[in-house]
């Protein structure tokens, strides 16, 4: 048997030859101990040059490709490739893991960097988005993540001189990042004119915002901020791969093989050209450089490491060499010396000294080398080449002996015969050639039996035979030297092989897994002396097997280090070492062999620590004679806990099914019943597959679990309390060491752990997100702060939690085999143990990971299955109980001894003060001393010991014990049979609680007149239970077979029981003795019922699809009901005992007449009239409504009707108990729903008086007793469950504002499209007309400076002649006229005691001073702000949070985000990027001000809680499937908040990281209905007020509606505000002003009395969107974009802010001489604004939407163009209409006075411009018009002489017309000579540069040239204002851009004197005034 066990010897990695120089950079450093750290393959190497020693870090599972050194230079971070790559932070001194960072990146980790103090680490992924991620590496926690770039990133670094700043570079880019909150925001480096845009390979940050970077062309680029300021050209002649900053300066290394040293200001110090040194060679390329003091380390592309001493820089010292890039396949060992030979595709053959660990010879060949061999005397070295040739060298001087080329394909293997006469050469073309060595390698034979390429060869010891392996896995033997194939078995038997390197053959069968035919083992080598075999495979693993190894699937020891294919492996000549070589990592590993005899002394080389450890699960180092598993444990390991449907899937399933439901629910659904039930008592305890799940609390109550319920049992009062927070089976339970807190873990797709308080039964924290399928073990740490949990997924994931915060601290894959227990070390909180099938593992925490070591059994025993474990009295000691009844005693990871404790498995053990207690399958509890030497006392659990006070009966003696707990003088015991017993220390046993044993429970019957019930189960027992307060099992009887149904006779004396074998029996109901039994059927008896009245007949239904009817008195079968097509599920009698109703598995509802059983067809109408004795049917019209929407995935299994026929209780497959009104007609009836059972509810029955409902859980084996609570008697305590479907259909009415806000879709700026329906080719893509100069053939710039030709006239008439023209260099936002009230709420607040107000419009936050009207702005948002709130906590004064729209495809800058900022200095304190798609619609601070709540606009309306200062997301959950308008924290809480929205109000609690919600309950008030809720406010004692769409305000106590303030307003209540200082509440609604009413009301704290305020706005309806209360003032924001201050005393209104109500604001005109301007908008108003006074002076209501507006040249008249085609001229002085005219049907787009005031030009969307002569008076007759305009008119400009007009049209064409004739002017030369009065055109060569590259879908919408004629501003569809020089004929001209507007700037103008720019917004209905900053003289 030993042949299949793992060998007991060991390999230890001693040396690695190589360094990874290819595809990596910056991966070589000095540590603080002056050692050198680098990596090769999958191993981190720490090399000490002084001692010439290597240490290895082996925590990675694949190629390492990046490395960073911690600033203190002891810790190293390394990143690897792979599907789930991770980062390890490790100690270079001890080479132990300190932290593991995982679960974020994919593909690989390309770069790493520590920040200045080493607290944070940044990593860059290899995924398509090159994700950048910042970690708090000690905690293993990701702080922030963002997409890095679309192309590869090569280097990243923290700016060591500025906090929270980073720089990254790569393919054609450099990016400067800032980290704020959880947001990483990049700015691209601007190359500008200073240097070419190119790939940057490396960088270093310096002081004063300087960054130095190395470019691909060998230049160094120097950056200041984000701008390139200079380049150092030709620093290297080719790409600069590495840059290293140190105290003295910078070192750079490049592809040119040079190292350059620079001082701190980047002036060159010196250059070292490595190619010119003696070790140098052509093509040497530097990949990594590190400068420390007077030493420089250099790593090259070809895997060399040089050390250079600065003052002897021409003598670099080679400290490491390896093979260069190219696959490495050839390996041979010298037959007599400790030498190894390798040959590679890099064409070099190298000889290594295994003693000195050095390269001693190297020879370059002409071809890639694929195999090598040294002959027996060590003189010749034969090399097989990739091209099929063969070269033989002399070993001593590497001179060539012979070169032969007989083959065209690669030589894969060659070997000299043991006697040295022959050389066998195996080729890719499947032949083997034999050469005679003495005949100068003449070919003497050939073997041709193979059909595939030759892979391995071996000679026999006598050199007469050769064995080969080929690619198809065949093994063939040949006679030598002729090459004849040997087939005779006899001949084969006698062969002895000189070496064994073949992978096929009897001796190596065991190296292959049992059932695989794969070809992934590349090389083996047998060690005959040590009887071990070493193998190398494709997965980077080197394994040791016993040799010979005959049986498949042998056990082994495995060693990792190589990253991918290990191509070859050989023993050294004396078997001291194993040499292995890596194909892709081209490294050579040298392993020391430690034979068995030395192992005894060498315990220190026990299991090696690693994340994927050597002695890993598959290596199963156990002996193969593991005892068979105990039957109980085996049964348990086969449980899967998988569900067809998980509870988490229900919401999605419901949504999918709702589509179908739409049609069905057009009818009104029946209301839910008034009655409720409450869980009262559960008979049952889950012992059959759980252990140690039963505890005493500190007050002596008992806590345990059954089904989905945590139970707290009071043994004095025999009562139970329940924790009902779980929704599926609980599998484990642990109790907190200090408090009465309990942790329970459940089954689920994403299963959760609930930590709850046994006193209040409230959840404290819910942990989820890291396990799958279920949680099988939990344990608290000794200080109670942490919790460990184990999942039941395939790798049994272990998670360590900080449970209060709900944070995952660490996670690791536990084991492939089932884990039964996890225990945390009471002395060291970072250590824990897990135990399970065949293993015991010791773990320690490393950052985000855990590192495990298997318990080391040594010679003491075998790896047994462990069922329980505890820690002892020191941190090293641990004890575990095995499946064979032993207790194992461990010190550290070593097994010290074993003690026999029980017969059969030890299931539970606990440590006491002075000893231990254990319990086992043998039903014995044993007490032990503190060293497990003596057993002090045993207690056997026997019926004889049962004390008189027991609540029930013991089913059998010595039941298997699964849980033990200790109390004062008592031991609490839980058994497999579902019993909980209390053992007194003196011996007597009291039974407290019991339930059925393992097996499904289906049969349930309640007694006709007593409070008792009977159950029968697959556990083969029939039990009678007392439902009265004594709650116990009265009687039990064992049956031969399990049973599925039972029924009491009407007189209660007999009990009929149907069994699973088709028989049934009748028993005496008191004694349970048999009366009579029958066996007429083969299949399960599924239902059994006595006929009502005297009980004359008994109907027996079976799965054979028959119902048999028996006469009870005569004991004869009198009838059979035939005709069912499927098994029978339910039967009911009618009240006369004449008719049977039958349900079948095929969902048929059938009727039979008794006693004969004749089938009857009864129309459904008649069925309702029949009076039934019982109703347990689930089919038929009367109960159509009990089938859920998701009926496809779940069956209703049982129902039962109350005797008053009012309430129908049902049970279903998902574990829900529901109550419906009866009859439940119509589909999908409303119900109340209760969760306690975990899966199928198999039966439900009301007791005889309907006072209780009894329910049975099938697989959870529990019997639950519920008490019924009728509506009237109910105290305020409400016991409806959360999910009950009791919502009403109506939502309280319709309101246009609410509907619009609900349906609005927010586009993000980046996706905005044209606001005008333009068509045609964009200007910058049009074919350009040649200019005058070009037409005349003049080369640009070549005109003579003095010319006879008249000078070209000015393009634009300059108005400020005489002044020096000063260009405008910047715009600063000075005023914003506008407020977003139309679809936001509660977004105007007081600050600074009411001196300032804060609000928002577009994407700016505005701080507005009430007294002066001055404004300051927060402009960091890059898109529209949707919500705003102010932190009320005094510690966070003036802190504001604003949320914006966005698009969350990835967490980039366009993601929706919340900014938290200081309102006074506008500093951003934190940015929270959300995964809410679309935007953030509500924000709220918690009471302490530390937490922030945000609500998303995504379809789930996700609610998220943040710790905003850290940028950490604490919790997140879908809020509701319809729009949530507001969510607010309770003003006194950090954990409670309320959300309101469409037909929804929810009361939330934050528990750890989980959000728990309760729906508002309406059931206590008559006729209350769930309306759409719009606002929320709070009162003391958990009162909540919500404003509704109908104008009512609902008042809630906790989550129950307690009253309604009817018609608080006459329309929707949009806003509510709670004043913290006095508790008064302000409400704002939508209503028409009336004498007594008002749109704003101030209420007392209880909302009983109020005072109304009217807003004197003159509107027909006032619609208030925001209210806030300060000292004696109320601040109101309205839908009409006004902000009004109302005095509380005098009710006086003061309008602070005005704005347009609806946009776009198309019309904009500035006064010719004063700082006034006009705006005209869709809302039908024209408004006059005063910039100096910062306010609106006047407004005119036109009654129609206005599109354009214009001042006359003198400023005395205003022309207004309307959307309906009309235009109006007003006199400015009186605002009287001077004239109006409507000649067009469509909108007027532009209107202009000519500079001489004579003409008015009117441009419309009818592709025309009309001219009117104003001198003819106000009749306004059209004098002519322009024809042939190809599209609608956008803008027009007159020439300075009023004789021409330029027109821009909707097809991107500009035309010039003569005035007033309207004639089209086409002569370009003439056009070029026109001087224009104004320029607002977006078209024309002069403004070609304003069109950007990114305008496929969006346009430049407006432009305006300054009065000085040298500056130009534009507005575009993205909402940007841009400033250019004028003219700008070059494409993509340089400009400055200014953000602030929402998408679409509709118009823009300079004011007189170019003092300001005014811009008008489309979507934001706001006008912005920008101050122009002129360049100084």
Swiss-Prot record:
GO terms for cellular component: cytoplasm; microtubule. InterPro entries: Beta-prop_EML-like_2nd, Beta-prop_EML_1st, HELP, Quinoprotein_ADH-like_sf, WD40/YVTN_repeat-like_dom_sf, WD40_repeat_CS, WD40_repeat_dom_sf, WD40_rpt. WD repeats lie at residues 59-100, 104-145, 148-187, 195-233, 235-273, 280-321, 323-362, 364-403, 406-445, 449-488, 561-601, 725-766, 770-811, 814-853, 861-900, 901-940, 996-1035, 1038-1077, 1080-1120, 1236-1276, 1420-1471, 1475-1516, 1519-1558, 1568-1606, 1608-1654, 1699-1739, 1741-1782, 1783-1822, 1895-1934, 1940-1977. Residues 1326-1337 have a biased composition (Basic and acidic residues). It is found in: Cytoplasm, Cytoskeleton. It comes from Rattus norvegicus (Rat). The keyword Cytoplasm applies. Belongs to the WD repeat EMAP family. Residues 615-629, 1281-1294 have a biased composition (Acidic residues). One of its GO terms (molecular function) is microtubule binding. It holds the Pfam family Beta-prop_EML_2. The gene is Eml5. May modify the assembly dynamics of microtubules, such that microtubules are slightly longer, but more dynamic. It comes from the Eukaryota. PANTHER family: ECHINODERM MICROTUBULE-ASSOCIATED PROTEIN-LIKE 5, WD-40 REPEAT PROTEIN. The keyword Cytoplasm applies. Residues 609-629, 1274-1299, 1323-1363 are annotated as: Disordered. Highly expressed in brain, especially in hippocampus, cerebellum and olfactory bulb (at protein level). Coiled coil: none annotated. This is Echinoderm microtubule-associated protein-like 5.
């Amino acid at each position: 048997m030993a042949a299949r066990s793992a060998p007991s010897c060991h390999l230890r990695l001693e040396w690695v030859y190589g360094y990874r120089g290819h595809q990596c950079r910056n991966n070589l450093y000095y540590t603080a101990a002056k050692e050198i750290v680098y990596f090769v393959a999958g191993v981190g190497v720490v090399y000490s040059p002084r001692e010439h020693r290597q240490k290895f870090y082996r925590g990675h599972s694949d190629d390492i490709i990046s490395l960073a050194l911690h600033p203190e230079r002891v810790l190293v971070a390394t990143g690897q490739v792979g599907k789930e790559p991770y980062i390890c932070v490790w100690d270079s001194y001890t080479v132990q893991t300190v932290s593991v960072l995982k679960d974020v990146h994919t593909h690989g980790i390309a770069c790493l960097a520590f920040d200045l103090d080493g607290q944070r680490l940044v990593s860059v992924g290899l995924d398509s988005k090159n994700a950048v991620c910042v970690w708090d590496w000690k905690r293993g926690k990701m702080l922030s993540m963002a997409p890095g770039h679309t192309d590869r990133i090569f280097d990243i670094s923290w700016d060591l001189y500025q906090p929270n700043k980073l720089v990254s570079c790569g393919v054609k880019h450099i990016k400067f990042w800032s980290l704020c909150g959880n947001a990483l925001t990049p700015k691209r480096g601007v190359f500008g004119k200073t240097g070419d845009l190119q790939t940057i390979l490396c960088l270093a940050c310096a002081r004063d915002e300087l960054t130095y970077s190395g470019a691909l062309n060998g230049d160094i680029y120097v950056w200041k901020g984000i701008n390139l300021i200079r380049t150092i050209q030709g620093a290297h002649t080719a790409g600069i791969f590495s840059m290293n900053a140190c105290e003295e300066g910078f070192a750079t290394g490049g592809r040119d093989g040079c190292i350059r040293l620079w001082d701190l200001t980047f002036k060159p110090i010196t250059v070292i050209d490595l190619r010119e040194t003696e070790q140098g060679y052509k093509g040497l390329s530097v990949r990594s450089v590190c400068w420390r003091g007077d030493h420089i380390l250099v790593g090259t592309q070809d895997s060399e490491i040089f050390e250079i001493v600065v003052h002897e820089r021409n003598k670099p010292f080679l400290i490491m060499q390896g093979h260069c890039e190219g696959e490495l396949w050839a390996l041979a060992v010298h037959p007599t010396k400790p030498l190894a030979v390798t040959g590679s595709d890099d064409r070099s053959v190298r000889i290594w000294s295994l003693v000195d660990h050095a390269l001693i010879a190297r020879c370059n060949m002409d071809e890639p080398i694929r195999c090598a061999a040294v002959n027996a005397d060590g003189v010749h070295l034969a090399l097989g080449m990739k091209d099929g040739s063969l070269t033989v060298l002399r070993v001593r001087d590497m001179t060539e002996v012979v070169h032969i080329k007989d083959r065209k394909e690669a030589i894969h293997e060659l070997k000299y015969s043991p006697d040295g006469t022959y050389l066998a050469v195996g080729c890719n073309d499947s032949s083997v050639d034999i050469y005679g060595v003495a005949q100068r390698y003449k070919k003497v034979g050939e073997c041709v039996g193979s059909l595939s390429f030759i892979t391995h060869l071996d000679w026999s010891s006598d050199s007469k035979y050769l064995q080969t392996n080929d690619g198809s896995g065949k093994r063939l033997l040949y006679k030598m030297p002729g090459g004849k194939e040997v087939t005779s078995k006899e001949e084969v038997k006698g062969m002895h092989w000189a070496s064994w390197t073949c992978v096929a053959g009897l001796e190596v069968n065991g190296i292959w897994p049992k059932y695989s035919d794969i070809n992934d083992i590349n090389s083996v080598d047998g060690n005959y002396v040590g009887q071990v075999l070493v193998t190398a495979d494709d997965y980077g693993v080197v394994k040791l097997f016993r040799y010979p190894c005959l049986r498949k699937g042998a056990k082994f020891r495995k060693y990792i280090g190589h990253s991918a294919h290990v191509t070859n492996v050989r023993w050294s000549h004396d078997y001291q070492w194993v040499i292995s070589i890596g194909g892709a990592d081209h490294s050579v590993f040298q392993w020391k062999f430690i034979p068995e005899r030395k192992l005894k002394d060498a315990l220190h080389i026990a299991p090696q620590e690693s994340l994927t450890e050597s002695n890993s699960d598959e290596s199963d180092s156990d002996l193969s004679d593991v005892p068979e598993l105990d039957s109980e444990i085996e049964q348990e390991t086969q449980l899967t806990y998988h569900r067809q449907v998980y509870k988490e899937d229900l919401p999605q399933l419901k949504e999918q099914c709702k589509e179908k439901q739409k049609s069905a629910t057009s009818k009104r659904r029946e209301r839910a019943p008034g009655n409720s039930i409450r869980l009262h008592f559960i008979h049952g305890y889950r012992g059959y597959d759980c252990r140690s799940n039963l505890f005493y609390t500190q007050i002596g109550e008992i806590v345990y679990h059954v089904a989905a319920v945590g139970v707290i049992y009071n043994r004095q009062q025999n009562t139970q309390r329940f924790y009902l927070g779980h929704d599926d089976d609980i599998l484990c339970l642990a109790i907190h060491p200090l408090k009465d807190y309990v942790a329970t873990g459940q089954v689920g797709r994403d299963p959760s752990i609930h930590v709850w308080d046994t006193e209040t039964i409230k959840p404290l924290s819910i942990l989820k997100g890291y396990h799958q399928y279920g949680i099988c073990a939990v344990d608290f740490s000794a200080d109670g702060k942490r919790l460990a949990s184990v999942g039941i997924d395939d790798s049994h994931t272990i998670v360590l939690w900080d449970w209060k915060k709900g944070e995952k601290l660490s996670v690791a894959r536990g084991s492939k085999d089932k884990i039964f227990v996890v225990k945390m070390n009471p002395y060291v909180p970072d250590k824990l143990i897990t135990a399970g099938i065949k293993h015991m593992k010791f773990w320690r925490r490393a950052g985000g990971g855990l590192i495990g070591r298997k318990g080391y059994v040594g010679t003491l025993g075998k790896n047994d299955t462990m069922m329980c474990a505890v820690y002892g009295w020191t941190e090293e000691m641990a004890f575990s109980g095995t499946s064979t009844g032993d207790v194992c005693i461990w010190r550290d990871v070593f097994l010290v001894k074993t003690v026999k404790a029980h017969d059969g498995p030890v299931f539970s053990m606990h440590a006491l003060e002075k000893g231990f207690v254990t319990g086992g399958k043998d039903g014995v509890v044993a007490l032990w001393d503190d060293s497990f030497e003596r057993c002090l006392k045993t207690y056997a659990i026997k019926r004889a010991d049962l004390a008189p006070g027991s609540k029930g009966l013991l089913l059998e003696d010595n039941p298997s014990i699964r849980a033990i707990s200790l109390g004062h003088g008592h031991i609490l015991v839980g058994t497999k049979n579902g019993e909980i017993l209390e053992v007194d220390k003196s011996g007597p046993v009291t039974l407290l609680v019991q339930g059925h044993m393992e097996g499904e429970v289906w049969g349930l019957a309640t007694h006709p007149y007593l409070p008792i019930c009977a159950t029968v189960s697959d556990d083969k027992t029939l039990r009678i239970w007392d439902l009265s307060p004594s709650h116990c099992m009265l009687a039990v009887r064992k049956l031969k077979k399990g049973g599925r149904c039972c029924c009491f006779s009407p007189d209660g004396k007999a009990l009929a029981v149907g069994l699973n074998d088709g028989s049934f029996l009748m028993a005496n109901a008191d004694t349970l003795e048999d009366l009579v039994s029958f066996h007429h059927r083969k299949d399960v008896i599924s239902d059994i019922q006595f006929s009502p009245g005297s009980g004359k007949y008994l109907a027996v239904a079976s799965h054979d699809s028959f119902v048999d009817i028996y006469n009870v008195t005569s004991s004869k079968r009198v009838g059979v009901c035939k005709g069912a097509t499927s098994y029978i599920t339910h039967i009911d009698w009618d009240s006369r005992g004449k008719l049977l109703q039958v349900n079948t598995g095929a969902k048929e509802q059938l009727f039979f007449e008794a006693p004969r059983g004749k089938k009857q067809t009864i129309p459904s109408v008649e069925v309702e009239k029949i009076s039934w004795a019982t109703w347990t049917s689930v089919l038929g019209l009367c109960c159509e409504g009990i089938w859920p929407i998701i009926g496809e995935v779940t069956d209703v299994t049982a129902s039962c009707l109350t005797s008053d026929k009012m309430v129908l209780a049902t049970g279903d497959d998902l574990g829900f108990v529901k109550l419906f009104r009866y009859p439940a007609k119509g589909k999908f009836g409303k119900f109340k729903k209760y969760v306690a059972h975990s899966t199928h509810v198999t039966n439900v029955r009301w007791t005889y008086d309907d006072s209780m409902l009894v329910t049975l859980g099938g697989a959870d084996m529990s019997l639950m007793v519920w008490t019924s609570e009728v509506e009237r008697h109910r105290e305020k305590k409400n016991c409806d469950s959360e999910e009950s479907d009791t919502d009403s259909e109506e939502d309280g009415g319709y309101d246009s504002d609410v509907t619009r806000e609900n349906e609005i879709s927010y586009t993000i700026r980046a996706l905005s499209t044209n606001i005008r329906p333009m068509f045609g080719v964009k200007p910058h893509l049009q074919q350009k007309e040649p200019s005058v100069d070009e037409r005349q053939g003049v080369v640009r710039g070549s005109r003579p400076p003095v010319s006879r030709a008249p000078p070209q006239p000015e393009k634009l008439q300059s108005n400020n002649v005489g002044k020096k023209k000063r260009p405008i260099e910047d715009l600063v936002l000075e005023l914003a006229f506008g407020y977003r009230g139309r679809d936001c709420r509660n977004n105007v607040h007081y600050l600074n005691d009411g001196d300032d107000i804060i609000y928002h419009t577009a994407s700016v936050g505005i701080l507005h001073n009430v007294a002066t009207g001055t404004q300051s702005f927060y402009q960091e948002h890059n898109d529209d702000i949707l919500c705003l709130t102010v932190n009320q906590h005094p510690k966070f004064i003036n802190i504001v949070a604003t949320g914006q729209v966005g698009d969350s495809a990835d967490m980039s800058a366009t993601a929706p985000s919340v900014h938290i900022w200081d309102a006074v200095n506008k500093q951003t304190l934190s940015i929270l990027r959300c995964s809410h798609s679309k935007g953030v619609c509500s924000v709220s601070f918690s009471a302490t001000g530390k937490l922030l709540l945000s609500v998303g606009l995504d379809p789930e309306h996700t609610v998220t809680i943040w710790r905003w200062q850290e940028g950490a997301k604490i919790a997140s959950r879908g809020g509701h499937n319809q729009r949530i308008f507001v969510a607010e924290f309770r003003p006194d809480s950090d954990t409670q908040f309320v959300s309101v929205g469409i037909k929804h109000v929810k009361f939330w609690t934050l528990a750890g990281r989980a959000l728990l919600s309760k729906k508002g309950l309406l059931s206590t008030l008559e006729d209350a209905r769930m309306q759409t809720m719009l606002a929320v406010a709070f009162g003391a004692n958990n009162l909540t007020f919500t404003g509704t769409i109908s104008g009512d305000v609902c008042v809630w106590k906790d989550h129950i509606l307690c009253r309604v303030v009817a018609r608080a307003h006459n329309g929707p209540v949009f806003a509510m505000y709670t004043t913290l200082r006095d508790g008064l509440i302000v409400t704002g609604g939508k209503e028409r002003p009336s004498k007594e009413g008002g749109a704003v009301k101030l209420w007392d704290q209880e909302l009983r009395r109020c005072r109304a305020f009217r807003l004197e706005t003159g509107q027909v309806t006032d619609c208030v969107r925001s209210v806030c209360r300060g000292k004696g003032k109320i601040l109101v924001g309205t839908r009409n974009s006004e902000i009004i201050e109302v005095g509380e005393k005098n009710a006086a209104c003061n309008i602070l802010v005005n704005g347009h109500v609806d946009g776009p604001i198309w019309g904009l005109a500035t006064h010719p001489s004063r700082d006034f301007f006009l705006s005209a908008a869709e809302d039908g108003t024209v408004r006059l604004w005063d910039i100096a006074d910062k306010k609106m002076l006047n407004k005119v209501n036109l009654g129609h939407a206005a599109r354009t507006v214009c001042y006359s040249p003198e400023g005395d008249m205003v022309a207004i163009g309307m959307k309906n085609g009309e235009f109006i001229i007003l006199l400015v002085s009186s605002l009287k209409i001077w004239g109006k005219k409507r000649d067009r049907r469509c909108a007027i787009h532009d209107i202009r006075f000519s500079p001489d005031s004579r003409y008015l030009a009117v441009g419309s969307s009818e592709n025309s411009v009309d001219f009117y002569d104003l001198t003819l008076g106000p009749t306004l007759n059209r004098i002519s018009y322009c024809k042939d305009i190809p599209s609608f008119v956008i803008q027009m400009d007159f020439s300075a002489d009023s004789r021409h007009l330029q027109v821009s049209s909707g097809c991107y064409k500009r035309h010039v017309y003569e005035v007033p004739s309207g004639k089209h002017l086409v002569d370009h030369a003439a056009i070029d000579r026109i001087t224009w009065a104004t320029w607002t055109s977006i078209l024309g060569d002069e403004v070609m540069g304003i069109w950007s590259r990114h305008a496929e879908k969006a346009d430049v919408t407006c432009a305006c040239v300054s009065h000085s004629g040298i500056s130009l501003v534009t507005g575009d569809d993205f909402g940007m204002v841009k400033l250019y020089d004028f003219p700008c004929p070059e494409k993509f001209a340089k400009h400055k851009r200014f953000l602030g507007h929402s998408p679409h700037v509709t118009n823009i103008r300079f004011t007189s004197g170019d003092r300001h720019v005014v811009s008008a917004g489309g979507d934001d209905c706001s006008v912005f005034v920008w101050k122009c900053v002129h360049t100084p003289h």
